[in-house]
Amino acid sequence: MKENTTFFAPMIYQKQVAPAIEFYKNAFDAVVLRQWNNDDGSVHVVEMSINGALFHMHEETTRNNELSPETLKGTSIALGLFVEDPHAVMAKSIAAGGTEIDPVQDYDYDYRQGTLADPFGHHWVLQKKIGK
């Protein structure tokens, strides 16, 4: 990735980061780029990439109300992930422990997409542009 380029990199809050790292590796072929641990060895922050799409995960913190969906009992956003084959990624994600919310289907706005919940409560919209 070029330095000084504007791009979007979400920060995903988790109760525990380590189990989420393993899920994203198995479900999305994510790779760990950098990781910072707490004194007790638990993961504090991790920088990851899914096929070049950068994101971070951080332990939830009540200090700034940066909380996980588990604590909130819901989520306020869905993370859109553009992939070559939404059906295949959905199947792989379910096998890794995710739960299908909406099956992958084609929409009249020229997207093929489906939604899943990861084991930590985050919603992912797996999608591909199929029209013009």
Regions found by a protein language model. Give the residues of each.
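C-terminal catalytic core of tyrosine-transesterase DNA break-rejoin enzymes
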Residues: 120
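Conserved beta-strand-loop-alpha-helix junction that forms the acyl-donor binding cleft
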Residues: 14-16
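Vicinal oxygen chelate
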Residues: 1-11, 22, 28-84, 90-117, ...
